Amino acid sequence: MERRQDIDQLRGLAILLMVMVHAAATWTPQDASTTSFFAILIAGLGGLAAPLFVTVGGWVTVQSTWTLRKAFVRFIFLIMAQILVNACAPHRFEIFTPGILSLFAVLYLLAPFWLRLANNMVTWSISLLLIGIINWQFLPGDSTLTWMDRINTSDLGELFSHLILTGTYPLFPWIFFSIFGAGLNIHAPNIRQKLAYVTGSLVLCILFLIQSFRDDIPFAQPTGAATLTFFPANTPFLVGAFTGVLLIWILFEHRQPYRSLNKLGRLSLTLYVIHFIPLYFGSNITLSWSV
């Protein structure tokens, strides 16, 4: 099946956003403002990088012919790529820390299961809703864990836990975005339907914002005490990322490539691995600016 340039373009955009947020995390001065418009814009766009990447992955998996042999080969390849990423970024990860590439490895291995959930419009919608509710009620990712807790892999039990529930990009709840992307491919909702989804999720985002004001806690933080957190990916984050990804999808789907952005998408895995190298070597550089 012929590659779609608009989907490659979305993947290229996800990689650019990921590079941007990793660079910002590496070089942003400790005294930089986190409440200025520029800082909020960078954080907001950066927070959409991984959800967009996984959503595109779900969309592309529908196009793929799945076999057990192919799944095992891809699983081994992606796990090795994750180890290579960790080796290129020892300042951020341990060598066997699960990450987004190991997430893709597990997702492709389990693709027949979650693609079945996405095949029917009703089961697609219910699956996304149930993931959000379960995550809201139980938050198995554990909000008390620190970054070091999430990357530490001292034994096989901890490694497996991080891969499935407690890591930086665990299978649950990130499978949400794979199912979402698969459904976008299978059901191809029209622009009116997509805007209805955006409207509903925006209403929820506003309610979450009101709740943060009432509770007198930050609306969004990477981790810690906030209404919306990335580590772990709580339900307000799932809703916010769903909204942002869908808006980006509306803007870029069926559009002509912008300045060869689609070509970046074809090199997404290579770019993801190698971008950690300059970040590692430059991680000790101290920068100072005002945002």
Regions found by a protein language model. Give the residues of each.
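Alpha-helical transmembrane segments and their immediate juxtamembrane cytosolic regions
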Residues: 1-291
